[in-house]
Amino acid sequence: MAIKVHGSPMSTATMRVAACLIEKELDFEFVPVDMASGEHKKHPYLSLNPFGQVPAFEDGDLKLFESRAITQYIAHVYADNGYQLILQDPKKMPSMSVWMEVEGQKFEPPATKLTWELGIKPIIGMTTDDAAVKESEAQLSKVLDIYETQLAESKYLGGDSFTLVDLHHIPNIYYLMSSKVKEVFDSRPRVSAWCADILARPAWVKGLEKLQK
């Protein structure tokens, strides 16, 4: 049975899963979820994701939700496909695990808030909360200071090869690099170079194209 991704083309979490699948050279069916009409909050969608969020993922009889859990499943189960997104060396895996936690716990909260305020709200006709932007930008700046130091030690955040750590960052960075917060990234040379590198990955570009068809 085909892999299916239920989600929204605008959703950073949906983008994350699509990019992972394409990095692994896996075919999948994208099933758009009409969030404007509240489809994600109703049955039958709630049978796929009981929290009423996107994406939801199906691989045969297996059903998953939460984008980072989905990408880890893909990277491990399909380890021999496409690009290797996990570090198999037990001595290197801990570093990757640490920075995956950093992305989810430190980077994601301010980055997601900024993506919502500066990337999504203008598209759907809502007013940006300038105070929220200022607060989140200050939080993000502190995180990126640490990233700048880490990227002096390795080419990517989890080590010297591109992994899920970096992939998980891409969707929010994609939105923010088209906003005034771009300067927060550009003012840190190593962070800026890292962003340019990961945003240029063919799998990311192909993933966007697939979701926006």
Curated annotation (Swiss-Prot):
GO cellular component, one term: cytoplasm
GO molecular function: glutathione binding; glutathione transferase activity
Top-level taxon: Eukaryota
Enzyme Commission number: 2.5.1.18
Signal sequence residues: none
InterPro entries noted in UniProt: Glutathione-S-Trfase_C-like, Glutathione-S-Trfase_C_sf, Glutathione_S-Trfase, Glutathione_S-Trfase_N, GST_C, GST_Phi_C, Thioredoxin-like_sf
Induction data: By auxin.
Gene3D superfamilies the UniProt entry points to: 1.20.1050.10, Glutaredoxin (3.40.30.10)
GST N-terminal domain boundaries: 1-82
Gene Ontology biological process: glutathione metabolic process; toxin catabolic process
Functional summary from the UniProt entry: Conjugation of reduced glutathione to a wide number of exogenous and endogenous hydrophobic electrophiles.
The protein's name: Glutathione S-transferase PARB
Originating species: Nicotiana tabacum (Common tobacco)
Taxonomic classification: Eukaryota, Viridiplantae, Streptophyta, Embryophyta, Tracheophyta
